[in-house]
Amino acid sequence: MLLKLESDTEHDLSIAFMLTFRCNYDCSYCESHDVNHPLNNKPPKSISDALNYVTSFYQNKSIIINILGGEPFLYKNIFNMFNNLEERIDIKVTTNLSFTLDFIKKTFNNTKINIKASFHPEYADPYEFVKKVKYLQQNNFNITSNISMHPNKSHFEKAIYILENLPRSKPHILSNMSVNGLIFGDSFSYSPSQIKTIKKYSGSLKKYIKCTYPDNIKYVTHQDLISKNLDNFKG
């Protein structure tokens, strides 16, 4: 069983903050959401004040806060929260980018925000997704894309379209929902040709993750971590 995961980072401190469990998608393979979870209605300043307080213990350190969900942009005051965070804090937000391009044009004006856009083929339109990502790239946002590789033929083809049209995107191997008390079940059953395709688009991913087990330490790629079911923690 896996005891600990460690990955290289450009920051001295990385904080993962779950802004909301609520999501407008209900993907069959996702455990990090609840379509019925109450929306976060806390004042934005109370959230940013709490995050500023935590980071105040790490003066002269480089810090990034990763805003997670659910879907973080369901929190209507998210931009006010961003604006109240101290300047020294870098911000990354993981989003399914399901809002309209018009919404992006009207509201996205803080290029300090790093965006990790995730494509989910059970719900998202690949053509609209590409349009939104390209618009943000053209307007100087630092945006990367994680593309969920569902083995269903139609879903897989949607993912390939995005990987072909967004050079900074990368494939994300999926796991089934948890079984037998493990965090994840086995990875989906991909055909040999699908595995070959995933490897093709994973060629530029050289980042390794340090995995600590009871009897040894391994350095594995993110793709191997998921596809070979190495991500089941003890407990």
Show which residues each predicted segment covers.
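Canonical Radical SAM [4Fe-4S] cluster-binding loop centered on the CxxxCxxC motif
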Residues: 6-47
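Core AdoMet radical
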Residues: 34-45, 60-75, 86-101, 110-129, ...
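A short acidic (Asp/Glu
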Residues: 76-79, 103-105, 155-159
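Radical SAM enzyme [4Fe-4S]-AdoMet core and its adjacent flexible, acidic
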Residues: 118-235
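Acidic (Asp/Glu)-rich catalytic clusters
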Residues: 57-58, 82-86, 104-112, 131-140, ...
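N-terminal [4Fe-4S]-dependent radical SAM core
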Residues: 1-16, 223-235
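Conserved N-terminal glycine/acidic-rich loop preference
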Residues: 3-11, 28-29, 108, 132, ...
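A short, N-terminal amphipathic alpha-helix
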Residues: 50-58
